[in-house]
Amino acid sequence: MKTNHNIFLKLAFNIAKINLGKTKSNPSVGCVIVKNNSVISMGGTSINGRPHAEFNALNSNISFKNSDLYVTMEPCTHYGLTPPCSNMILKKGIKKVFFCFNDVDPRTSKKFKNINFKRNIEIKKEIITKYKDFYQSYFLIHKKKELYIDAKIAVSKDYFTINKNFKWLTNSHSRRRVHLIRSEYDAIISTSKSINKDNSLLNCRINGLDKYKPDLFVIDLNLKLKKNLSINNISKKR
């Protein structure tokens, strides 16, 4: 049976999405291990960045010999706070490794392919257009030392940003989506004018993700932020 590698790589990206924005300086990676065209194990980068996805997927007593490993980013090959994932891949007898992105960390970038000279492991880089921007923020920070910034704007169909008849311009789906996005970011910047008008909380209110609150920065040049706002009651840190 011919293997559709993209199916397993897309599954790996879905796993990587789970902890996106919650792995600190490490990228959120997803890993899927396949044997005889069936998934036998999966893992993602843990909260705060460790253990890595490959370790979590391979940390089992089942046999991984001659299995295929699918991972969103090339496995690390350097010693840091944890041993390199490449060591565990060799130890477990993985036969083939498929990945989508080279890491930009100079300690490991494009070095995983060198293990093929030590062991007969087939290594192949696959491109999935749908996920070409998945690590955009990680690459921007590490390559250019720049912050990754998104802008959130609510606009009506007729291009207005205020509707006097309704509290929201957006629907419940888009509002929930915004809460999810907030959990993936480190900080939110808003203005005192906007917060005074909406009395917005600017946090994540999805069960299970509500503890991932981005830091809040308010631009208030004239010190007009009201004292009785909801944001003043939800967290001392913010």
Tell where the protein language model's regions lie, with residue ranges.
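Zinc-dependent deaminase
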Residues: 1-23, 79-238
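Acidic, glycine-enriched active-site microenvironments
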Residues: 3, 8, 24-32, 67-68
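Short beta-strand scaffold segments in enzyme catalytic cores
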Residues: 28-37, 153-154
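Hydrophobic "anchor" residues
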Residues: 39-40, 161
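Short hydrophobic alpha-helix segments
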Residues: 41-43, 165
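A short, polar/charged loop-to-alpha-helix boundary motif
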Residues: 46-61, 173-179
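Local cysteine-cluster metal-coordination motifs and their immediate loop/turn environment
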Residues: 51-52, 69-89
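Short helix-loop-beta connector
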Residues: 63-67, 184
